[in-house]
């Protein structure tokens, strides 16, 4: 008898990863979905509380992995409370070198230990933030690398890769999770409850939300 397929979601408690979680639950069933959350020294630590609450509320197993050692070898505005968030060249200073590679590697190690092949991550290159590790070419490359490194058939899914934020809100609505995601998820880089309305992450989220609500109101 074949084992029941399962999935693991790289989960921050934000809009994108929570949308992926609802997608995974819809396809695999709540009892067959887990989430992995990373503590990497992020200044918006409130997201860890949100992730914990959402996982408990939806009844999915959460594994917390501490990768904060990365603070000893790199610096950026996402991990420095005193840094001003700004664009530096083509890449914003909120970019954490190696973060998504690290997340995927650790998640894959965990997934294999649990007999899980499907990994969801909410990366997206449409509303491009300038993060090189959010590009489809990187994810595909990492998928091949992990399969070779562990001799295992991982399937990394990126359902939001080519969606705008407006389309991501629309997807949440289709999943019956619009109000839940709007109310309970955290996106703000500065860690402000309800959003600061000024950081790039808040502005992108609010722009997409307003565009979707305007479109929905005109239908």
From Swiss-Prot:
Q: Which Pfam families match?
A: QueC (PF06508)
Q: Which reaction does it catalyse?
A: 7-carboxy-7-deazaguanine + NH4(+) + ATP = 7-cyano-7-deazaguanine + ADP + phosphate + H2O + H(+)
GO terms (BP aspect): queuosine biosynthetic process
Task: State the Gene Ontology terms under molecular function.
Answer: ATP binding; ligase activity, forming carbon-nitrogen bonds; zinc ion binding
- This protein's pathway: Purine metabolism; 7-cyano-7-deazaguanine biosynthesis
Record-annotated residues binding Zn(2+)? 188, 196, 199, 202
Q: Which domain of life is it from?
A: Bacteria
List its EC numbers. 6.3.4.20
- Residues involved in ATP binding: 11-21
Describe how the cofactor binds: Binds 1 zinc ion per subunit.
What are the names of the required cofactors?
Zn(2+)
> Keywords on this record?
ATP-binding, Ligase, Metal-binding, Nucleotide-binding, Queuosine biosynthesis, Zinc
Keyword Zinc assigned: yes
| Primary role | Catalyzes the ATP-dependent conversion of 7-carboxy-7-deazaguanine (CDG) to 7-cyano-7-deazaguanine (preQ(0)).
Query: Belongs to which family?
Result: Belongs to the QueC family.
Tell me what this protein is called. 7-cyano-7-deazaguanine synthase
- Protein species of origin: Glaesserella parasuis serovar 5 (strain SH0165)
């Amino acid at each position: 008898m074949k084992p029941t397929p399962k999935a693991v979601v790289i989960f921050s408690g934000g809009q994108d990863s929570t949308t992926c979680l609802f997608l995974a639950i819809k396809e695999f069933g709540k009892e067959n979905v887990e989430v992995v959350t990373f503590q990497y020294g992020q200044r918006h630590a409130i997201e860890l509380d949100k992730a914990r609450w959402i996982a408990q509320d939806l009844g999915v197993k959460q594994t917390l992995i501490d990768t904060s050692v990365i603070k000893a070898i790199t610096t950026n505005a996402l991990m420095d409370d005193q840094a001003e968030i700004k664009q530096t060249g083509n890449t914003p200073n909120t970019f954490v070198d190696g973060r998504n590679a690290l997340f995927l590697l650790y998640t894959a190690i965990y997934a294999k230990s649990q007999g899980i092949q499907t990994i969801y991550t909410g990366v997206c290159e449409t509303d491009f933030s300038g993060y090189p590790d959010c590009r489809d070419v990187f994810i595909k490359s990492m998928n091949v690398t992990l399969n070779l490194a562990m001799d295992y058939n991982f399937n990394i899914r990126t359902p939001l890769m080519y969606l705008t934020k407006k389309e991501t809100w629309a997807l949440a609505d289709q999943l019956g999770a619009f109000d839940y995601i709007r109310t309970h998820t955290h996106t703000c880089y500065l860690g402000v409850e309800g959003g600061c309305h000024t950081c790039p992450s808040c502005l992108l989220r609010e722009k997409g939300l307003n565009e979707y609500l305007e479109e929905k109101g005109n239908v």
